[in-house]
Regions:
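Helix N-cap/beta->alpha junction signal
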Residues: 16, 88-89
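Conserved active-site segments centered on acidic
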Residues: 1-80, 147-157
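Phosphate-binding/catalytic loops
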Residues: 83, 89-158
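Hydrophobic beta-strand core positions in alpha/beta domains
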Residues: 7, 85-86
Length: 158
């Protein structure tokens, strides 16, 4: 059963932040309650701001990130989470190396969505269309992930 879902990227201002915001909206739209979602970055810092491109894209998705503050990943985050979804294989490798006890709940977002292996590439510093492509890719995976979570949670409830 997945009740606490953590998204992780590098800086926690683009990929994981978008995944958090969009998944919260999707969960609400699907009427799925009691699922906590949050995000962190391996190099998260209050000093890093969400890029304007990301703020615009999330506004278009009705998934506001205006008050989002980048935060670093902690051991407490990992122990609290039922499911940890990362954007790059490097993120998974680093987390499992530092916290081997959580290896069984850390997955690449793309792989957990059933879309094969591979990373969700970081668009930071690239063109606006790269941010949009990243957002679209994450949104597609999230739709699959939320369906998977819904099925898993329904089967555990019965």
């Amino acid at each position: 059963m997945y009740k606490k879902i953590l998204f992780i990227c590098t800086g926690n201002v683009c990929r994981s932040a978008m995944a958090e915001a969009m998944s919260k909206k999707m969960l609400k739209d699907f009427g799925l309650k009691g699922i906590k979602v949050w995000s962190r970055g391996l190099a998260g810092s209050r000093m890093i701001k969400v890029p304007e491109e990301v703020l615009k894209l999330m506004d278009q998705e009705q998934s506001n990130l205006d008050t989002h503050i980048s935060a670093p990943l902690t051991a407490k985050d990992l122990s609290k989470a039922d499911l940890v979804l990362v954007m790059e294989s490097y993120h998974q490798e680093r987390i499992v190396a530092d916290f081997p006890e959580v290896a069984g709940k850390v997955f690449l977002l793309k792989k957990f969505a059933g879309a094969g292996d591979g990373d969700v590439e970081d668009p930071i510093g690239l063109a606006e269309e790269d941010y949009r492509a990243c957002k679209d890719e994450i949104k597609d995976y999230l739709q699959k992930v939320i369906l998977k979570i819904r099925i898993a949670n329904d089967s555990n409830d019965s």
